[in-house]
């Protein structure tokens, strides 16, 4: 086999190799879920992704015999490190064939890069924030994949452990059936909260009604997500950009909020699982893939809970039960 050459992504061709490598690695895996490539191009664009404003990053791609065989991204999130008194670099969006030599070549280059930039340790997979897919999937490979979670082959776990890495934190996805009848305890909690009239429960019928709530939801997210590993709070500019980007694709009927004395104290955001539509168009939204995704949004029987939180001083009062039952 030829020599492994690791190079930094500097040109548009390099970036194309980087972005589309995973579909080559997973081409024989029928259950693999591609990303939405339109989003991928924006994710790695320093002009469009504002995270580059507070983070240093490097993209590397490994070639063997002039063919791309592996990729990795390194990130130093200065904002996170400052807030949490950390001194770590991150690796993320790593893909390669089942080849220990390629894996080692990539991870060792990121380790070197992190050390050269004053970092004392490396953690990952962890992107710019917790809102990027993070971690390696280590079990549950028999279940369908979905777009917001880790999407890796089982061998990646062995490859990273062989490099001396150990678990930092468990990240858990839950899959559950929606019961036709909720447990009696849920009904009692919901009845009690409703009778007290202490909280104002708000549902939405349209995006015009939802729009004024988006920024308050993101402000509450900053507060309630502070204890989540890897979370980076959004600044005012990012809140506006986040709202502008996601409001068009949110379905108001799957968003629930709770207020106390006019102040937002809880929120839950769900959206239909679009995985089948994304697979059908192979992650290519334009020009016609959007129709597969829109069609799936209407017929999907799975709901993904994307975000949710309750203000700390109101936890344990059944507000999460109220929103869960209603959604």
Residue locations for each model-derived region?
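Generic start-of-chain signal for non-secretory N-termini
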Residues: 1-31
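Acyltransferase donor/substrate-recognition loop-hinge adjacent to the catalytic core
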Residues: 2-4, 150-229
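A conserved beta-strand-loop-helix scaffold within acyl/acetyltransferase catalytic domains
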Residues: 22-59, 63-64, 72-82, 204, ...
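Acyl-donor binding region in acyl/amide transferases
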Residues: 82-164, 281-327
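A structural signal for short, well-ordered beta-strand segments and their strand-loop junctions
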Residues: 120-127, 168-175, 257
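Short, solvent-exposed loop/turn segments at secondary-structure junctions
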Residues: 128-130, 179-181, 207, 273-275
């Amino acid at each position: 086999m030829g020599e492994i050459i690791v190079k930094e992504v500097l040109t548009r061709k390099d970036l194309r190799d980087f972005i589309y490598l995973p579909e080559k690695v997973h081409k024989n895996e029928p259950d693999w879920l591609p990303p939405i490539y339109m989003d991928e191009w924006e994710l790695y664009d320093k002009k469009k992704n504002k995270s580059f404003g507070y983070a240093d990053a490097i993209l590397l791609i490994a070639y063997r015999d002039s063919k791309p065989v592996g990729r990795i991204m390194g990130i130093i999130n200065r904002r996170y490190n400052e807030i949490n008194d950390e001194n770590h670099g991150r690796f993320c969006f790593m893909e390669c064939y089942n080849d220990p030599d390629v894996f080692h070549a990539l991870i060792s280059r990121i380790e070197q890069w992190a050390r050269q930039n004053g970092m004392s340790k490396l953690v990952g997979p962890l992107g710019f924030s917790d809102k990027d897919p993070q971690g390696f999937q280590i079990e549950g490979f028999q279940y369908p994949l979905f777009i917001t979670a880790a999407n890796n082959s089982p061998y990646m776990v062995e490859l990273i452990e062989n490099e001396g890495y150990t678990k930092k934190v468990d990240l858990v996805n839950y899959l559950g059936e929606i019961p036709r009848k909720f447990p009696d305890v849920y009904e009692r909690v919901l009845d009690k909260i409703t009778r007290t009239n202490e909280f104002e429960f708000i549902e939405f019928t349209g995006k015009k009604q939802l729009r004024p709530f988006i920024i308050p939801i993101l402000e509450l997210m900053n507060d309630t997500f502070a204890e989540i590993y890897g979370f980076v709070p959004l600044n005012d500019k990012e809140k506006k950009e986040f709202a502008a980007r996601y409001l068009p694709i949110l379905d108001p009927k799957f968003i629930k909020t709770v207020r106390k004395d006019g102040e937002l104290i809880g929120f839950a955001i769900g959206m239909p699982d679009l995985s089948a539509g994304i697979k059908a168009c192979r992650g290519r939204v334009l020009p016609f893939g959007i129709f597969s995704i829109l069609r799936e949004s209407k017929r999907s029987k799975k709901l993904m809970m994307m975000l949710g939180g309750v203000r700390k001083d109101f936890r344990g009062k059944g507000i999460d039960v109220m929103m869960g039952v209603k959604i």
